[in-house]
């Protein structure tokens, strides 16, 4: 299993994880990152090219998969970013509270055990009014698609490092104490609907007066 996890899975993610519709959304939301950035689940490093090096001082990367880290380091060398890969000892993020300007998560919250507690930990390291940028997939709004998601979830969990396609990501983000201030959603081609319903947007750790929701075309 370690061979698949570290030698096969990272290349599978690199091959499948960034088709044009997804890449275009990365290009839109990741330049919003600024200051000290914490990215959870760096994957193969496809986000690096979308950070603005004139706005981002440093990127801390949490990635438990050594195979992913090797691919991400190849991408890091192509940028002008200052990047530090950090370990996750236990469940405690090894950064001081209130020190991070931006937290980034792309296609990671579906895999984390105890995801609400993990999100609370991310909220703690954010500075007051720091920003959480997310781009995730999960539970579709259509009942017929949800049925297929529940049937397919065991396969997703096996093939994609514990991926849960039945998670309601906005609800989990809110449960952790974040306030979503911008969100868009929709099915993203070319993947089947059982795995392609996504949300992308931003949230803050303190309550805001309002939020706006935009429905993307399906």
What are these regions (language model features)?
Residues 38-40, 44-92:
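Class I SAM-dependent methyltransferase SAM/SAH-binding core
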Residues 16-36, 46-50:
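Conserved alpha-helix/loop element of class I SAM-dependent methyltransferases that forms part
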Residues 178, 185-218:
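Core SAM-dependent methyltransferase catalytic element
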